[in-house]
Amino acid sequence: MGLAVGAPLPQGLYFVNTGDWGNRSGVDTSVGVTIPVLAWSTPWTILGGRVQFLLAGPLVEVGVHHTTYLRGVYNPLVAGQLAWDLGNNWGFSYLLGAYLNMDSEVAWSSTSLNQRFALSYTGDRWNLTVNAIWGTHFDHVTDRPQLSGCPAPFALNGCNPDFLNVDLTATRKFGDWEAGLVAFGSTDLNIPITGYQKQSQVAVGGLIGHNFGPAILQAYLTTDVYEKNYGGHDTRLWGRVILPLWTAPTAPPVATPLYRK
């Protein structure tokens, strides 16, 4: 959310860090996440699409009031992406990557294929983006419960459902400021084992951001308007910093002679 991920990035190397912290009502569970991402927009194209690469190493902490506190490394992401400039301020991107298996209490116990389809409109200072994220786990049931344990009597196993997430962004820039609405939804796509209850949620919120020149800062707040089998509604505060580490120099304009023979 908050990024025009359908549009190709200008050639360069970028650091993006998204952090969020929230609490789920009813079960009094708090979750904190930080997602540092290194993105490289290359000078190459394939079929007219800009070739881009992304690496992410998320960290997660989970706390249940007066019960447990867990923290560790989430599944790292390795991905490649093609992003097309469709003209008239429209862009489309396709990402293919994988979240790698990680032996951690706060990670899925399986490698998953990750595909993302994004469409963005960026005309007249708008960012209108829809981003669909489709995850397919290679191992739906494992011998490590980790982030997602199976229901009894299989509590010592891990259940890793396939999933679909959809992120929506509708923001507009006003000078160096940006403001607008964001939303996301997620749902499990399959039942890994008998007795597993598929989870889903929908959340909406607002975003504000500011371009400080070398860095862009964003903040947004979301809250669930629908949830199923999560045990409560989630409210989360998000923050993001976008920092260009290097950008390709632009070619100087070709001078037009004032006099021709």
Enumerate the predicted regions with their spans.
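Transmembrane beta-barrel domains of bacterial outer-membrane proteins
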Residues: 1-43, 50, 56-68, 101, ...
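Short loop/turn motifs that connect adjacent beta-strands in outer-membrane beta-barrel proteins
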Residues: 4-12, 26-28, 42-52, 66, ...
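Outer membrane beta-barrel transmembrane domains
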Residues: 20, 143, 147-261
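Sequence/structural signature of outer-membrane beta-barrel proteins
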Residues: 20-26, 58-66, 83-87, 97-106, ...
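Transmembrane beta-barrel outer-membrane domains
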Residues: 27-33, 69-75, 106-112, 157-163, ...
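Loop-centered beta-sheet repeat module
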Residues: 94-98, 110-113
